[in-house]
Each structure stands twice: as C-alpha cells, then as structure tokens.
Amino acid sequence: MRNTVRPAIWCGVVIGVWLIFRDVARGQVVNTPPVPDWIQAPGNKTNEAAFFSVGVELPPKMLKVIFLGASEGNMEVFVNGRAIGGGSGGSRAVSMDLTSSMDPGKNVIALRVLNPAGPARVSALIELNADYAQERWVATSGRWLARTTQQDGWSKVVTAPEGWEPAVPSGRVDATGEKNPFEPRNLLDAYNSWKLALGSGVATDPSGLTLPAGFKAELIRSALPAEDSWISMAFDSKGRLTLAREKRGFLRLTFDKNQTSKIEVLDHNLLECRGLLYIGTSLYANANNSKALVRLTDDDDDGVFEKTEELLKTEGGVGHGRNHIKRGPDGWLYIAHGNNVKPASQISPRSPLQRVAEDQLIPNPWDASMFDGDVLAPAGHVLRLNPANPAEVQMFAGGFRNPMDMAFNADGELFTFDADMEWDVGTPWYMPNRVLHIVAGADYGFRRGTGRFRQHFTDTLASVTDIGLASPTAVIFGTGAKFTEKYQRAMFICDWAYGRILAVHCGETGASFQGRSEVFLSGRPLNVTDICVGPDGALWFITGGRATQSGLYRVTYGGSEPSAPLNVTPTPPRSGAAEARELRRRLEAFEMPSGGVAGSKLFEEVWESLAHSDRWIRYAARGALERVAATQWMPRAAEEKNNSRLIAAALAVARMEAPERASAILERLTRVNWRDLAEDDAVGLVRALSVAFARGGAPSSNLSSAVLSQLEAVYPSPIAVLNPDLCRLLVFLKSSKVLAQTLPLIAAATRSEDLVEYPLVLRYLKEGWDIEARRVCFDALGRAGKLAGAQNYFRAIQSIRTEMEKAMDPTELAKVLRTVTNNLAMKAPPPPVAAKVHAWTLEELIPHLDKVSAGRSEAGGKAALLKAQCTACHRVSTDSTVASGIQGPDLSQISARFGRRDLLEHIWNPSKVIDEKYRQTTFVVQDGSEITGVVEREEGGAVVVRQNLLSEQTQAILLISVRERKISNISSMPEGLLSVLTLDQVLDLLAFFETASKPPVKP
C-alpha cells in the first residue's frame, strides 16, 4: 500500500523539458544543488492559475527522489498526472518524498499554483539520489515551460505544444535579504532528513510511510523527553521489550494487545548500549561508552537483574565502536566492533582470523594523517565469545569499517551491512556501503587511508551487493516473520540517514551469495536504529540516535498471499550451492591432523580445493593450509604443476614464513608461463608476490631480476583491474621500464580512479623522468580535478601534485606547468599580508547584501579571495585556474547550501558552526600549559598537531606528557578576515561564491 497526501483543490503550474542525467564514473558524487529561481507563467494575473511542468529521466538504481517547493499562493504537485500533495507560502519550502511515485525512465513533475493576492510564483528543487553516491538536482529556471490556461493532460506534458512558453525567471530565491525558503538550516536534503526528528516531540506518523502492497505500519509508542533517544532493543522470553537509551540504562515495555501497558526504567549505569541480546533470563549488553560487554542475570526470574558481570573489556574510541551482538547457531555470541575499537587483549590463538597485516607494498606517507589514520588491521572486526566460557574470545573476521549489526540467515550464514568512508568517493580506494557475507577467517580489506584492499585481491572477498548513498545501522533476516515467502527469506538492512529499510534478496552463488536490493519501507524522517522479528511474527523497529525523537513501530502483513512461517530445514535433494557451502565450512573448520598431513584425506581435500572454481572455496582452502605447518607441504608446493594450487600455496607461504624460507616458492612463480594463466590466477600471482614483499621487504637481486623479467613482458595487461597492481609492484622493484609503459595508460584514462592511482604510485620513482612524463602526470591530475569527487579525492590530487613538484628542478617545473596550466588547478600562493581597512560588523554589512547581484567584479572577487586568505585553506571554485588549498572544507559550491546572509555570518563568525571533522583539540600537558591545534596523526607514542593551518609547521606532543585533551569550540579559521577588505571587496567576494556555485550553462 502506498500512502500519499490527499491533494488539495488548488490551481497550478507546468514545464516540459527533459533533463537526462548521464552516468558518471562509479564512486563519484556531486552533493551541492543549484539555487532555484522564482518562476512565473508569462502574463499570469492575480487569482489566475499558472501551470508548470518538467520532465525528469531517472538514473539507474534510483534511491530517493525528494521534491522541495515554495510558492506565492497555493501549490499542488503532480507526478505523471497523479496528484501527490501540496503546500502554500513562499517563506519555507515544503518537502515531499516522490520515490514511490516515480516510474523507471521518463517522468513528468508538474505544478499548479493559484495566488489570490498577486501573480503566481513558484520555486522548486528536485533531489535525485542514485546508486554509487550520485546526486543530481533539477531546479526551477527559464528552462521550465509554463501556461495560464488548463487543458486535458496538462500534468503529463513532455514536449512544448501550442500554448506553452518558457517560464519567466524573476530572480534567485536568495537574491534579496528576505528569508530564503530553501535556507539550509530549515531545509534538509535526503541524507540529512534524520535531522527532521530533532526536537519534534512525536515520532513520524506511520500513515506517511511507504510500504509494499498488503503491509501496514503502526506507531506503538513515541518516546517522551525523559525517555531519551533509543538505539537498540531486544525481546525477552516473556514478550517484553527492552530498549537501550542513548545516554545510559534501559527501558522495559510490557504490552497488552500491542499497546504499551507498563513502562519500567531499569536503573543501570551502562552507557550507550548499542547491542542487546537475551539468552534465557540473562541480558547481554554491548555498552559502547562503557567500553565493555556485560551480562546481567535475573536468577529468580522476578524481573530484577541481581548480578552484573563484565565479560569483555576493550580499549579504543567510541565513534565506530562496540555495536550489536547476535547469538550464532553454535550458541556463541558474535560481537560487531567498528574500526575505532582496539582488538581485545585476550584473543584466542585458535581464532579463525589469523596472520593479519597491513600488507601495503608501498606505504603511503599521508595515510596516517587521514580520517581514522590511527586504525590498524584488522580494523573493524567480529569477535566470537563462548558465553559458557567467556575467557574464550576468538577473532572471527575482520577488515570492516563499521559493521553496526549482523544477522544469521536460516542456513546459519552470517551477514552485515558495512559503512563506506564518504570522503573517499572518486578515489581508487573508495569502498562503498556494502552487504557482506561474513565467513570464518575472512579479511574484508578495510585499511586506513589509501590502503584499502581492492575487491579483486585474492586475500579478500567480494560483497554480496553494494548499496549507494546510505548510513548503515541494523540488519535482520525475515526468518520467523508472518510475511510472504519473498520477505521471510529477505535480509532487511536499515539506512539511518535516508530513512529507509531495504530488503536484500540473496541468491545462492556457489559457496556464497549475490544480492539485489529494493526499498521495503521509507519515510521522512525515519532514522532507524534497530530492527527485529518479534514473538508475534511482526517486524518491529525503532528510530532515534543523535538525540533525535524516537518511536517504536510494528510492521505486519495482511495481504492475500500465504504468510505462514516457512520450513527452513533443508531437505534432499540438496542444491549444488548447499553442497558448496558445506565444503567451504569443512575447510573453515579444518585443523592440522595430529599425525601430520601424510595420508590425510582431509588434507587432500584442502589441497584439491586450492584450485576450485569457486573463489570462496579457494579462500577457505588457503586458510586451512595456513593452519598446517608450512614445512609439511612446501616441498609439494614447489613441485605443483597446477597453477592455481601453486599460486594459492605461494600466497599462504608469503603470509606464514620469513622471506628466506619463502624465496624458493616465489622463484617458482617466476617460471610460470603467463600465457597459460587464467585471469584469477594472474591476479593471484601478482598479489602473492606483493604480499611477500610487503611483509618480507625487497627480494634478493636474483629474485627481483626474475620478477621484473616476467612482469615487464606482460605489462600493460589486457586484464584492466590488474594494471594498477602490476604498476605498483614494478615501481617497488625499481623497474626501468614501468614509467614508459604506464604513460599510455594515463593518457588514455578517463575514470577518476585511474587518473589518481597511476600518479600516486609513479611518484615513488626516483629515476627515468623527463619533461613529457611529468607533463602526462600533471595533465592527468588536472583532468582529475575537473571530475566529481569527495574531500579526500581532492586532497589526494593536491598531495600528489605537491610531492611531484618538490621532486622537480624549478626550471623543469616551470616548463611543465606552462604546458598544462589550463588543465591544472593552481596551488594557492602564500597569503599576502594585508593592512586592516575596517573592523566590519554584521549590522554594517547586511543592509548592502542586495547589491551582491548588481554588476560585481569577478576579478575583484578573486582578488578578495587572496586578500582575505580564503585560498590558503579552501578549494573555492570548480574553475581549476583559481588558486586553492585543501586544509579546510570545500567552498566551491558553498552558496548552494547557504544564502547570502548565512554565508556572511559564517565568514564573520567562523566558530558559529564547526564541522566535527575540523574541530581543534586542546592538550593540557604536565606543566599546565595548553597546546591547541588540528590533530594530524598519532604515531610512535606522540600526537602531531598543526596549530596554524596556514603553516606547514607541526608540533609533536608526547602522549605520556598529556594530562587532559578536550575538544575546542573555537574554529581554526581566524576571525576578522573581512577586516582587510573594503565594502566593495566584501560584496565582490560574496558574488564570487554565488557565481562559482552556478552549474555550467549548456549550449
């Protein structure tokens, strides 16, 4: 059933221009919208209807379509001829979620407006959020069509028939000092829709939620102010629901006919329990801010916990912290930890995940200064703990960023929904939000900085499916729900930011799964924090987090399809996929035979499986091999004729043995005939050599020569994903040919990932460079700077370019820059020392804001940028010839988020709002003095801070000397920057930001 707003009886507006959004490179994002114009229908009069319409073609894998509109008069909104809802008033835009109303491909969004007090004016912004973090916008402008007479089918217009004319723009919505209806503090894009729940006092009305036909959502309870925000939940054996409060402690709800009949505050001091689980009368709580896993026991079953035991204590941060817990089919507890949690000290040597390392062939020097730069392998991880013997704690799997939750399917397989690092979009190391099948001993490849494992690496595993824009929270399978079979078998994953619960349908693929996702439930706001199947067979979920309004909801199915719980017990005949999973599990459980491997049938199964066609089985077989002493099988590996087994064994040796013991089998790899290799084996061979050298250091001269001879002959490879790996390995071995072999790849590159990765790797070469090679790399960085990407993408471009410049002779650099100036963003010069003109106040400047639009000087704006030192820290324009810095937030689209007055206020008072990622930290040291700055990195027992973002100078503070550290509420951006500008220069500066944010005009 789709719930929509009942249309009002209003008159309205239409446009008919098709805006087609072409695919951009995977992993790229443009998150800044254009500023809408107010538009009118030509000749429209007071109390006369105006009609407007625009055609929109949806990109593939559309996630969310949000309509934002304001009108001088009453407005009604239509999608493909269907009335959706409406609003009135020009001071604040109304918001509507159009996702479920849109059709694949072409759509028409039409408006009808009637203003009894004057001509009808309207402004609108349509937000299209597509997969792979693509975001596009449609704003009202003169490209819309309009008319003042109604005709049949007007709300489905896709062309410009008789009677339609271009709409008449009457200025941007922020053109005057009046209130902007799209003011960002009042108006939130889809990603920030959770903020709508801040201070709302009541949870989102379920009648506004979108669900499949036959499903119904009920709001069981809205949290009262004293009940805090809710972040996790669990039913006990009596059907009572325990809710974890964001700050501390729990609530327990007792129900009577699905209504809350009793609420109890469980007076406990555990802080921020992100995970709750009942086993019998014991409640297990993963208390993030208490940094402990705790068991609370109600021995006499009287509803009071008499005993509290700390089962596991962990150190580290709390952002990506101690998350959900689940009970596995083996009876053990499975505990999800984000990458800020340091692995527990008592990890068992019997853990499935062993021998984890960074495995960076060429460590990147600025990885440690990036976000989460202190994170080391295994990063985010899943622990396994035996509740009967809590001392037995095993590392089950790792290589995650922040797995908030996990879920077992009906067959006992474990899954999670891991988070991306949104700053990395556009880079070759970007990992999307991904659904992962978690198997014993697996490393899913998350590493700090640029070191993320690529999905094709042999020593990691692929995702079940990638999800685009999202903020992952809870997950659950529909097992036991009174739903249709499709949804009983589905995995439900929760997207906190976009207000969605997605159903992921996992199809068997060999020993693992591949999935496709669909939106099951959505709302705005609907910041879902936890989800479970209740004892009544309904799907229960809660909203909350970040101090937002919480609600408890219940979803049931009342349609005509069968909804009895499925018999999930497998019956013969077993599928081939089930048999493949059984083989994978046997390999994961394999232990070294007590009598050695000679004559062992189990070991023979391991050895044969190294060449299995299924990647997951090969991975499990290599893990089993690593649990056997290498001395027992290395001689056999050296004589192995099958390339797949040889390469898998070589990777195992590289992970297990010292370099001198691994050299024989690595030398054997150099004698493999490359032309005989399947694609997987070619990838595996390069990865085995890379891991061996990353862990063991540079090889002997003989082995190095043999590897160079083999790989230089096959580089570049027709296997596209392999070329960056080959390039990296050849650079590490100081190949004399790799530079010349890579330049054609760079020149032909169009993807942002390739334009960044090759220069990133080649900058380590010390010899062989000439003017042309430098020019090709600088040109690639210039082209990369014109593509879309997130913050770390542009930081990487800047850092690579800076390092390349430092490695060049000034005369040579000047020659190169003369040939690529038009393509390369200029580095910001040192900020000039300017005399103060006047200590401006807001009261003096605000009355002049209406002059920003009138004939301002672009040259004056650029000069003001330099004089006010904006370019020393910020990227200020998409024009790559404008100087830029990267220490601060990207301002190239700032006026799309802030109106004139807000932008002026933020420049005048930088500490008004500070992005968490740019907050300074104050360190109080032993002598009582304070040092304040932005943390660059922590390493070697010291923290390195930059006290002045305009200087390259940093200061190291010994951690043992730190008495206290506290977050500063003072921005690193100094006050008074406008005091060096005249009034005209201030206005030119604001005009420059507005112009820089406008999308390019299409011919």
Question: What name fits each language-model region?
Answer:
Residues W10-R22:
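Bacterial N-terminal signal peptides
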Residues F78-G85:
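Short strand-turn-strand beta-turns centered on an Asx-Gly dipeptide
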Residues I220, L283, L333, E844-P847, ...:
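C-terminal capping alpha-helices of c-type cytochrome domains
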